[in-house]
Amino acid sequence: LGLIPRDEHHWYNKSAYFNHNNRDKFAAALDLSDTRGRDVFLKLCAVSDVVVENFRSDVMDNLGLTYEAVSAANPAIIYVSMPGHGKTGPEKDFVAYGSNVEQLAGLVSLSGYEGGEPMKTGFSYGDPMAGTALVGAVAMALRQRNRTGKGCYLELAQRENLTMFVGEHIVDYSMN
């Protein structure tokens, strides 16, 4: 699998942030454009509970690693797709980063000084808020799977997740 071993001798050369967020993790690099990489991926999926992908909407389809293909290897799999702008619509193939998703979701319009231009938030909320929504969705999907024995497909667009921050402002704008 090409697992990357821990560098026990030089852990102190990494930042505290890196060490905190990557403690006890292992990594495997797979070339999913190669048949062998896809085969290893599907073997990993066969023994996994959850698969999360965060590519543009067409990437996993083009690789032949759709929910249907993965669930054939493991019918109980929970497959989560997190495209930045969703799987449908005119912007589905756009690449998404936390900062541009914030702007397109309207979050930056809530920042800045009164009468001034909108400002990017100090912290890029796009990525961690998508991860927060992911945790809740996967927890519910695991509970449902424990009841039914069946896996499922979930789509969580990063841009849609950020609208939870602007919802009341959208309602206020549309009513006033």
Locations of regions flagged by a protein language model:
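N-terminal helix-loop segment corresponding to the beta1-alpha1 unit
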Residues: 1-147, 173
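Substrate-binding/catalytic subdomain of NAD(P)-dependent oxidoreductase enzymes
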Residues: 141-176
